């Protein structure tokens, strides 16, 4: 089975469009992507959910009525789980949900996520954001010219903070710094747009995993 394929990725430059050849995974493993996304979301969980046991609820430990001769079912204190307002059995306690995922799996997952966008024709590289910096109103015009009309959600990855801040005003755009590129944000958006500096950072991150 062929592991690497050559993808022709469109590059948008001030002088027009060209193509860049890139080596990326030929096969996309959905389960591996799921594993990486699950790992990411587990790391983000706060893990603060907490319930009280019968020993922690604010009730007396006194037996509510005698064991015998009342004609009623036998019970202990009112904090027992069987009563409304009583303690919870096996309820959640604060915990750390994060776990370790091999670095090789994470790198391969990132390469596959980008390759999937390239295979779908939904990966666009940008040579420069000329005239867009410091002009919020210039971003929509640039996006329209690049073929991004807002009908699909876009992940914009660039090291240019001014461009990221301007693009955040568009509700269908998610912005990230190159170092923050991750599988979850790629798969939850429909298109991926990166400048060439971000592309270089991505290539360095995946190393030989493509």
From Swiss-Prot:
It comes from Thermus thermophilus. InterPro entries: Ribosomal_uL4 (IPR002136), Ribosomal_uL4-like (IPR013005), Ribosomal_uL4_dom_sf (IPR023574). SUPFAM superfamilies: Ribosomal protein L4 (SSF52166). GO terms for molecular function: rRNA binding; structural constituent of ribosome. This is Large ribosomal subunit protein uL4. Gene3D superfamilies: 3.40.1370.10. It comes from the Bacteria. One of the primary rRNA binding proteins, this protein initially binds near the 5'-end of the 23S rRNA. It is important during the early stages of 50S assembly. It makes multiple contacts with different domains of the 23S rRNA in the assembled 50S subunit and ribosome. The keyword RNA-binding applies. Keywords: Ribonucleoprotein, Ribosomal protein, RNA-binding, rRNA-binding. The keyword Ribonucleoprotein applies. GO terms for cellular component: ribonucleoprotein complex; ribosome. GO terms for biological process: translation. Belongs to the universal ribosomal protein uL4 family. Part of the 50S ribosomal subunit.
């Amino acid at each position: 089975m062929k592991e690497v394929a050559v993808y022709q990725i469109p590059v948008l430059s001030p002088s027009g469009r060209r193509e860049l050849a890139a080596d990326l995974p030929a096969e996309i493993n959905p389960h591996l992507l799921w594993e990486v996304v699950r790992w990411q979301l587990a790391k983000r969980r706060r893990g603060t959910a907490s319930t009280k046991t019968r020993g922690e609820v604010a009730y007396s430990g006194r037996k509510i009525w005698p064991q015998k001769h009342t004609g009623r079912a036998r019970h202990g204190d009112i904090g027992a789980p069987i009563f409304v307002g009583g303690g919870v059995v096996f309820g959640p306690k604060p915990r750390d949900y994060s776990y370790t995922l091999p670095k090789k799996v994470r790198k391969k997952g990132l390469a596959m996520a980008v390759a999937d966008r390239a295979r779908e024709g939904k990966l666009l590289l940008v040579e420069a954001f000329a005239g867009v910096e410091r002009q919020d109103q210039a971003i929509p015009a640039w996006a329209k010219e690049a073929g991004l009309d807002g009908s699909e959600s876009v992940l914009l990855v660039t090291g240019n903070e001014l461009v990221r801040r301007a693009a955040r005003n568009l509700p269908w755009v998610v912005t990230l710094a190159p170092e923050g590129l991750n599988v979850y944000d790629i798969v939850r958006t429909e298109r991926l747009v990166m400048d060439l500096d971000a592309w270089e950072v991505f290539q360095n991150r995946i190393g030989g995993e493509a």
